[in-house]
UniProtKB/Swiss-Prot annotation:
SUPFAM superfamilies on file: TRAP-like
First-listed, main subcellular location of the protein, grouped into a coarse class: mitochondrion
This protein's record includes keyword Zinc-finger: no
GO biological process terms held by the UniProt record: inner mitochondrial membrane organization
Record protein name field: Altered inheritance of mitochondria protein 24, mitochondrial
GO CC aspect terms: mitochondrial inner membrane
Species of provenance: Talaromyces stipitatus (strain ATCC 10500 / CBS 375.48 / QM 6759 / NRRL 1006)
InterPro entries, sorted: AIM24, AIM24_sf, Trp_RNA-bd_attenuator-like_dom
Cellular localization per UniProt: Mitochondrion
UniProt keyword annotations, A-Z: Mitochondrion, Transit peptide
Family: Belongs to the AIM24 family.
Amino acid sequence: MRLTLGKGATAVYRARAGVSVSSPLYRRHGVRNVQIKAAPLGEPTIVNGVNLPISSTPSSASSADAKFHVVGTPYSMLSVSLSASQNLYTQRGTLVGLSGKADNVISTLSVLEPSRRAIVGIPFLYQKISSPSPIKALVSVRSPVTSFAVVHLDGTVDWMVAQRRALLAWTGHSLKIKPRINTNLSVTNWGSSEVTGRGLLALVGRGQVYSVELKAGEQYIAHPSNIVAYTLSSTRPQPYRFKSTTLRFQIPGLQIPELLLKSRYVRDLTASDTWKASMKLIHNFRTWARRTIWGDRLFLQFNGPATLLIQSRGARVRDIMSDKEVNEIADTPTGATLDAINKLEARTSPSTNENDKIDYQRAAEEAVSQAPGPSRTVEGLTQEIKGVSQTIATIRDGKVEFEKLKQQNAEIARK
């Protein structure tokens, strides 16, 4: 960094150095340049992979027969340089322009495993471009919020393209791309492609694409919608759920007319066991479907060494939280709500009984104190009431049974 001294600082410097204004040294060097360098800070130590280096992806990759170069800020177009007799596969409708001998260029529509790719939603229509002479092509996409990332495969490390439409173009005679289904994830994240061999890949992601490098022993948790691609190692990424990933929203309920609520038929229907069992079954099925099929709360855990390509815009708001997710957050099973209310009433009932007992005790004391005649206590009055209402005999099936005889028979049986 270059620092220019002001007049005051220059005068102080001249006074200390003994240089006058008329000195030829001063006339030759009217301003003194001072080089100031900041002291280098220590690099942050990586503790259990907390401070992971996140960097932008390389803008170019080259092999012996081709070269991929990303142009634009942000990366918005791919420049492909092909040698003679080299094949380029790109998604249909993404070729922008081409330079070279156009008469030698051969373009055909290739259908790549439609039966396997169509099931999981991976594009299977690609445009194959080849020429006996060197050519240069420009490839782009229609979406305005995408960027490119290029990957060079040397045959030592295989890659897995996690997003369905992330694979834009590739070249390489030994490069093989096979669709894969990861049954550990939800259906929305089943469309993956395994890439093996040697060649160049051009991937496209929403927003910006960044690279995360994991060393041996490091771990990283990422959402499947943000993972563009990753390297394959001995330890495959495993599904991961956080201990608490639920969001609680308060959504106002429906204003059901009171006349309908007071209907005897509706009350009997909602109070029946069949209704409760059916509602519980439907709620369990909906919860299972939301967690298993859509699975927006499911993450992936990666173990190093590995390289991840992450896109900044994983999904739209509608994809992140659909109507089904909102219903899952807002809905609660009717049986569970009623059980909670019953439990709350059961918890509060003992305190209510105690309050009633206290009020009864106070009222009884006031009544006894104000009653005419000899003064009596509340306990004595209670004993008198019990004595008056004491039962001596009961009639069962036309027979009279005395309580004293029952007590005597019970004592004899004990002895």
